[in-house]
Amino acid sequence: MKRRNFIISSLSGIAAASVASTPILSSCCTAPKEKKQETPLNLCLQEGVALGDSLEEKLDFMEAHGVTGLEVGGGNLKSRVEEINKALQGRNIKASAICAGFSGFILAEDEQKQQFDTTMREIVEAAGQIGSCGVIMVPAFNGQNPCKPHTMDTRNYLCEQLHELGEFALKCGTTVILEPLNRRECFYMRLVSDAAAICRDSDSEGVKCMGDFWHMQEETSDYAAFMSAGTKYLRHVHVASRGRRLMPGEDGEKDDYRDGMRALKEMGYQGHISFECGCEGDRATVLPAALDLLRKQWEEA
């Protein structure tokens, strides 16, 4: 029965989140059509993906290729606030999401929970200081132990903990961003709709979620995944090739993102699509080609 209640509560997020971000027709009367505003494609690179030996060189590369977001890791972020703010000053690039970097995990049943609370809040505070949109987190990876059991009580506990963390993030001027993973990496939260439902039930504007083209392909359609969260909850997107998690385009025809991009355009998504991937070929050639591929598919979506 507990499992049934858990599933019902999670799946209801699809309808609730979508309705929250979808306009409702108030009448069938013909009205003048307003010109639809185009949704921009905002591209972002993780710091380790961009070309360059220093942060300045990486940002120079990004500016030269029209990339407007920088995703950095959360490890030692507190000590890098001044460096990052100085490097971004005067550029058309801003700090996007922060990629984890904390110790422990939120569903731990031992001292790892305290480690999470301390380090996560430190990263969240630093994220606000560099103008980041949020800190990415996964409630629990496969293999992390001891972990709370997969029950409705655990889900309720998670929502309570996220409410507190989300409210703290808001005070810091940022958010926390839940990332669903595929079943090989995470037993707990695999669907964007699951994450959106947890955002809803956490009852804090400081709790958001994201989608990752790599993880989503194993669980649901890209279009359905993004639409299940809507603009109310969707804050960030990751992208990689769809065969080996390399640069978009390195897996050939498999690397088709147009279905998900169509959802992002229809909902008016304003966040970044960030490269989280490896690279097999010459990065100086492959990375610009990957950026061009995403721009082409965005136009076609």
What are these regions (language model features)?
Residues 78-87:
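Active-site-adjacent beta->alpha loops and helix N-cap segments on the catalytic face
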Residues 10-21, 33-37, 106-208, 218:
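Active-site acidic/histidine proton-transfer and metal-coordination neighborhood
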Residues 62, 88, 123, 127, ...:
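Generic structural signal for hydrophobic
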Residues 68-77:
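A short beta-strand-loop structural module common to alpha/beta enzyme folds
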Residues 88-113:
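Mid-chain, structured segments of secreted extracytoplasmic proteins
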Residues 2-44, 51-66, 131-133, 189-211, ...:
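Histidine-acidic metal/acid-base catalytic patches
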Residues 49-51, 76, 101-104, 141-143, ...:
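Active-site-proximal loop/turn and secondary-structure-junction residues that shape catalytic pockets
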